[in-house]
C-alpha cells in the first residue's frame, strides 16, 4: 500500500471515524469562503489541500497544509496583531485543521494525538473560528483518545502536595490593616450594588458570589494538569510586562507548571490575560458569569473572560482598563492596590502610546525623587482570598501581586 493511503492509527479506528464525521461528506460541501485579501496562490493551495484530503492522499494533504501554514504564519507575524486581517487567521485555522486530521492518518506514534492537539491549539490561539468552531470539536474528540498520562509531578519538596509548593523569593504580604481597605459586602442586591458602587465607580469586594462555582471545590494544581496539561498556552516570562527583558512564549500547561511552579526557575512565568475558557470548555463549565454583569449595557457573549494563573510573586504593574472588571480569586491570595482615575497625574502614566494605560511607578518600591506626587495619592488595598470577587470600576488604576500559587478569573464587561 502506498504512503498516501496509510490506514488509520492502529487500534484507533474509532478516532478516525469520529474525526471524519465532523467534516462534510463531499468536498464541494466544505465551504472555505475566503475573502479577496487572501493571495490567490494561497487560496489555490488551500483548495488543493482540501482536494487531497477528500481523495485520501494524506501525505500530500499534510505537505500542502504545512505550506499553507507557512504562508499564513508570515502574514500573522507581519506588523501589529490588531492589523492582521481576519481572513488570514481563517486560512491559518484551515491549515491547522487539515494538518491535525492528516496526522491522525499517519503511521502510529505515541505522540500523534498530543501533536494533533498542539496543532489545534495553535489554530485556536492564532486563527479565527471556521466551520462552526470545528477545531474545538476536533480537540474534544482527540482528548477522549489520549493515552493515560503520567501522574502530575511533585515539586522539590516531595513531602508536600504540589498545590502547596510555592516559591519563597516574593516579599511578604503588606499589613493592609495599616492601609485603607476596600469595603466588603456579602451578596448585595443588584440595585444596591448598582446605586452604591457601579454608578459612582467605587471598588468593593463581594463575598459569596462564587461560593457555588464547581471550581471552588474542584480546582487544584493536579486537577488543572489533568484537564489542561497537554494544551498549548501563551506564557509571559519576566517580572512585569514593562521590563525590557519581558517576553512571551508558547508551551503546554504541564511544561508551564513544571518549569515555573514546581521548579525554582530563574525567571517568573505567568499565564496572564488569556481566554483559556474559550480554548478549554471543560474549565469554563466550572465557573459562572456573575449576576451583576447583567447591569451592563452589553450582551453576555460580549463579556471577556480571562485566566490569570501563576506562582507566588507574579506582578501586574499599576495600570487601568477601559471596561468594568470583576476579578474572582479561585486559588491562593493576591495583594491589590487601587487608585482612583482622579489620581492619574500622581501615578505618572507612561508617555508612550502603547503603555499610556500603565504607571511608571514601582508601587511597592517607589522612586519618590522621580515621582514625588505618588506618595500623596490616596489608595485602597486588599488581600483577595479564594471566593472573593473584587469589583474594579472602569479606568480605576490597579496593581496586583500574587502572594501564593494563584488562579484568578476576570470578567471584563461594559
UniProtKB/Swiss-Prot annotation:
Coiled coil: none
Free-text comment on the cofactor: Binds 1 Fe(2+) ion per subunit.
Superkingdom classification of source: Eukaryota
Catalytic activity: L-arginyl-[protein] + 2-oxoglutarate + O2 = (3R)-3-hydroxy-L-arginyl-[protein] + succinate + CO2
Residues binding a protein: 236, 273, 316
Keyword tags: Aminopeptidase, Biological rhythms, Cell cycle, Chromatin regulator, Chromosome, Dioxygenase, Hydrolase, Iron, Metal-binding, Nucleus, Oxidoreductase, Protease, Transcription, Transcription regulation
Disulfide bonds: none
Protein name per the record: Bifunctional peptidase and arginyl-hydroxylase JMJD5
Species per Swiss-Prot/TrEMBL record: Mus musculus (Mouse)
Amino acid at each position: 500500500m502506498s504512503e498516501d493511503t496509510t490506514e488509520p492509527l492502529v487500534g484507533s479506528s474509532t478516532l478516525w471515524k469520529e474525526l471524519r464525521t465532523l467534516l462534510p461528506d463531499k468536498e464541494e460541501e466544505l465551504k472555505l469562503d475566503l475573502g479577496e485579501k487572501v493571495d490567490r496562490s494561497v487560496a489555490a493551495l488551500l483548495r488543493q489541500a482540501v482536494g487531497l484530503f477528500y481523495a485520501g492522499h494524506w501525505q500530500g494533504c499534510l505537505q500542502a497544509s504545512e505550506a499553507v501554514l507557512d504562508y499564513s504564519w508570515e502574514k500573522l507575524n507581519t506588523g501589529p496583531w490588531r492589523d492582521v486581517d481576519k481572513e488570514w487567521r481563517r486560512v491559518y485555522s484551515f491549515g491547522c485543521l487539515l494538518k491535525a486530521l492528516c496526522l491522525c492518518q499517519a503511521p502510529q506514534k505515541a505522540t500523534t494525538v498530543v501533536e494533533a492537539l498542539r496543532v489545534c491549539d495553535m489554530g485556536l490561539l492564532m486563527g479565527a473560528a471556521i466551520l462552526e468552531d470545528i477545531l474545538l470539536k476536533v480537540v474534544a474528540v482527540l482528548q477522549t483518545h489520549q493515552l493515560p498520562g503520567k501522574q502530575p509531578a511533585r515539586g522539590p519538596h516531595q513531602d508536600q502536595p504540589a498545590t502547596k509548593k510555592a516559591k519563597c523569593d516574593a516579599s511578604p504580604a503588606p499589613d493592609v490593616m495599616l492601609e485603607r481597605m476596600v469595603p466588603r459586602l456579602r451578596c448585595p442586591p443588584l440595585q444596591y450594588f448598582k446605586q452604591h458602587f457601579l454608578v459612582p465607580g467605587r471598588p468593593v469586594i463581594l463575598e459569596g458570589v462564587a461560593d457555588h462555582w464547581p471550581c471552588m471545590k474542584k480546582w487544584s494544581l493536579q486537577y488543572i494538569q489533568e484537564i489542561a496539561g497537554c494544551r498549548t498556552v501563551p506564557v509571559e516570562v519576566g517580572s512585569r510586562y514593562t521590563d525590557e527583558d519581558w517576553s512571551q512564549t508558547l508551551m503546554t500547561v504541564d511544561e508551564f507548571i513544571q518549569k515555573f511552579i514546581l521548579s525554582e526557575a530563574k525567571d517568573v512565568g505567568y499565564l496572564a490575560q488569556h481566554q483559556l475558557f474559550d480554548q478549554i470548555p471543560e474549565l469554563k463549565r466550572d465557573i459562572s458569569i456573575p449576576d451583576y454583569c447583567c447591569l451592563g449595557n452589553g450582551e453576555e457573549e460580549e463579556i471577556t473572560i480571562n485566566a490569570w494563573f501563576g506562582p507566588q510573586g507574579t506582578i501586574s504593574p499599576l495600570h487601568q482598563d477601559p471596561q468594568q472588571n470583576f476579578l474572582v480569586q479561585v486559588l491562593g491570595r493576591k495583594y491589590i492596590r487601587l487608585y482612583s482615575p482622579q489620581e492619574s497625574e500622581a501615578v505618572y502614566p507612561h508617555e508612550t502610546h502603547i503603555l499610556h494605560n500603565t504607571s511608571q511607578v514601582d508601587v511597592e518600591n517607589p522612586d519618590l525623587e522621580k515621582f514625588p506626587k505618588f506618595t500623596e495619592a490616596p489608595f485602597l488595598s486588599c488581600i483577595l482570598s479564594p471566593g472573593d470577587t473584587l469589583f474594579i470600576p472602569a479606568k480605576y488604576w490597579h496593581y496586583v501581586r500574587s502572594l501564593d500559587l494563584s488562579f484568578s478569573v476576570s470578567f471584563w464587561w461594559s
